[in-house]
Amino acid sequence: VIIALPLANNKQMSEIINKLDGKVNKIKFIPELNGTYTFNSNIEDYDGIMLVSSYNGMNRGTNKFLKRSFDIITGIVGCVVLGILYLIYAPKIKKDGGKAMFLHARIGQYLKTFKMYKFRTMYADAEKRLEEMLSKDEKLREEFYKNFKLKDDPRITEVGKFLRKTSLDEFPQFINVIKGEMSFVGPRPVVQKEVDMYYGEENSRKIFMVKPGITGMWQANGRSDVENYDERIALDLYYIRNWSLWLDIIITIKTIKNVIGKKGAY
């Protein structure tokens, strides 16, 4: 698709590109010199007119192979570490009578529901406790529905607090990576209620074209320190539009630094 609208302002051009993004393989447009677009792009000449060719790198066959290869390598390493962590922490987690790991329904690629693995960090009756707390405390309810998290969550066990602070509770998700349900790096895996409340049709169409990730732009930028939900969605959209294997490597390095420094974790 070629967009040639010399009288359109930056906002109008952005709206048109956003509507086409994901519906066609390639977008070409004549930009204003002061316009800023952060998509994967190339500059092309079209009979003396400068075109910016924008594309989604994830749609290319070679890139899909590279990303899946990266997932398999990190998935194997992650599962080996998971085995060691399970031997150490499973007995401690089971002390309150529940299972060491649990499955939680999340929305994956193409809006399909899948079961995501996690170490159990909450009491066995956590959902019941949550309903009771939210029904009694309006401020707590507002905090929870803002980010679907509570900073001082009374449902979390003592060992669970440590697992969350160190992000070790995420390691079972490497099983999902090996199964092909998740990527190591990708948009945040969310629940259906988050999709209904915050995403909208356009954002859902773009974000759920790809697999969710164990880590991503949100985690690399401070995890829970990113408080605005719209900002989280914007970070996921930026990742999809600008994906490259190098970006995955950068996000991985930044995530490791944040985990070691326990930045934004609770």
Across the structure, where does each feature detected by a protein language model lie?
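Short beta-strand/loop motif that positions the catalytic acidic residue
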Residues: 237
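Residue-level signal for cytosolic alpha-helical hairpin/rod architecture
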Residues: 51, 156-159, 234
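A short, structured surface patch at a secondary-structure boundary
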Residues: 143-210, 251-259
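A hydrophobic, helix-centered structural microdomain
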Residues: 62-129, 176, 245, 250-266
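N-terminal hydrophobic signal-anchor/signal peptide
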Residues: 1-83
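Short, glycine-rich, amphipathic interfacial segments at transmembrane boundaries or analogous
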Residues: 34, 41-44, 101-154, 215-234
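Hydrophobic alpha-helical segments characteristic of transmembrane helices
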Residues: 23-24, 28-33, 171-177, 220-226
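Short hydrophobic alpha-helical runs that function as membrane-insertion/retention elements
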Residues: 28-29, 139, 183
